[in-house]
Swiss-Prot record:
SMART domains: WD40 (SM00320)
PROSITE patterns the UniProt entry points to: BTB, WD_REPEATS_2, WD_REPEATS_REGION
Stated name of the protein: Putative BTB/POZ domain and WD-repeat protein R783
WD repeat ranges per the UniProt record: 215-266, 272-310, 313-353, 355-391, 436-476
Family: Belongs to the mimivirus BTB/WD family.
UniProt entry keywords in alphabetical sequence: Repeat, WD repeat
Ribosomal protein among keywords: no
Keyword Repeat: yes
Amino acid sequence: MNQLSLKLSMSIIKIIIMATKKIQLDNFIESQNKLYSFTKEKLFTDVTIVLDDGNCQTTLDLHKAVLASKCTYFYNLFTKFSESKQSVIKINVANSYVTANIIASFYSQNTDTRNYPHWKYYLLEIMCLDFLGLEYDLEYFSKIQVPVEGFELLLDVVDIIGYTSDTIPIIARNLPHDYDFTKFPMELIEQLIKYVYSFDIILVNSNGIIDFFNIHGDKIKSISTFFTNNDIKYYTSHKINDELIVVFADNIVNVWNIKNSVVEASLEYPVNVKTRFEHFCYLPSNNHLISTSSYNIYVWDLSTNKLIKTVKKHKNTITGIHVSPVNDSQFVTIGRDDRICIWNAKTYNIVRCMISPVDCICYSSSGRELVIVNKHYIKVFNVSDGTFLFKMKINLNKSPNNIINSSYGKYIINYDAYIKIFYYPPNHLNDCTDIYCPSNYTQGIYTPDKKYLIMNRSDEDYYDVYDNSVAKDNKYVCNSFRIGKHVSRVFMFKDSSIGLFIVKNSLTSLYENLTSLMQLQTQEYFP
């Protein structure tokens, strides 16, 4: 009975204590609200603060004692500087509205942040709190995402916090695609390049849109070409370099500058060509663009935009064209006539022909071998003399779409819903490995750093990114990204890919240019 009475007494005491605390809190809030109301009524106020951010001014009648007790900045202002004798004090601040909210919090008032989106108010608040010498919370800063128009404000805040291993990745994550990176010092660029993806993915869609994505699947920008008419029978494209893409649509050929989003040139179109152009290669040394149509190859000089040569050597439709990775004075064509033709790119004469059933082909990394694939086997030929070097049976259930030379000795064949990996020269991993894929692919391309394999699906509006850097035992980590329109079909045709390209982003290009410039300057000073 005594224990029960004791418990009851303790419960009553707790209730009384809680009630007392609530009364005290209510009284405190009431007194703070009353004190704040005095600022509105100008009762007992002894200083007028004018907050000026350059765009707007906010005037507040306040109490020095409250300001000085809550903020060291105001304590010093009222005791150590000439403003201590002034009744009206003007203060230049980052934002008058946010600073006024901070001062209102000295009176225990809830702040109204509805005038700004959360990210903007948060950044402005850090700037204003820092100005007043008050602490700020950085928990949200680590995950902040700002729109393009907020990037400069983000940089202003990083200037306050400092450029550290914590803040530089935040800058990298929020970098606008077209930002003028020359504003950055070289030291910052050297740090940013560690965190920024190095390459952009370009997808040329069948609706006449050139879309840009980063490696994480985020769309960066789009360029709308004038080829948006459903009467167009075909639409295809080829990347010339990191700035130019040539776009074919019916009897029009335009060279687009993808940096400036403008048509840089129009190419002369061949007379009486009734079949579509399908396969392309670019020869940087003589600035020639080569394309195939039916049995013929066509050569444009991009210096003059003129068609300079038409050559017919194959006896059936040409199904592929590839330029040597080490010497663009040579390229190879394959056709349905099973002819594999090696060309001199200076004279446009055939140097050598080999006969072998072939669906797709690629050069080795050294440029000394040709690797050809059909649904039954893989063959390797010596480029210089055409001798047969290697053969391996594979027996695919469908003809392969393409073959990619991923790195020295490692090749990827794309067929049906699989990726097949094999090695040449043979080694202990020589047996082929099949990786099941979410869909059939029509195109595949590696980023120049060989870290990512981007595959373009044929039956869905996705592209897949395989992370080669974490691949173990030939198993890739795959991420799929929705891209909206089908990028692997052409109007009225099902079997042609339009365009899947990789370009360096502007930060990577700037870093390489600045690094080269610094090396040249070093050579000049220290020959």
